[in-house]
């Protein structure tokens, strides 16, 4: 997988709780701003999730970070590490309860799904935003390939968490696949996809889960 993290493929990855998979297979992924009152199992930092509602996106289509569905450019993220270990006060969860959605910026562009991306964690003041695929050289691809998110260099740590932000909604057609922890989880997701009539590849890949 590490070699596949490059600008030519521009793969993007979203970590979700498996409880959210079934409705997502029916209607895709919606941004937080449009999901008020909808049952959804959050897995990130609750304080940061709330703060993102006030962080403006400085380029079109605008809005705030909560108007976007966030992805990373790697499945091996600090967020997943925190969920796995319970680090920094994040609720610890078994990896079998987690699924990773896979898409790509090229796929989104082909489907004309609006998106922007950043050079580092989108909430940070220094974050740069772009919707131009020519700016994918902002992403520190060799560091992502090395799975190096140690905090020996803060700039590196921030840039490791660069985000792809999909405006409002990610349709099922934009997904290249769903990766889960084991064969049992894969069977359950495949059954849910069949029930929803969603044509999406499902794969068990334990190595993705750190």
Across the structure, where does each feature detected by a protein language model lie?
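Active-site-proximal loop/hinge segments that shape catalytic or ion-binding/gating pockets
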Residues: 1-73, 77-210
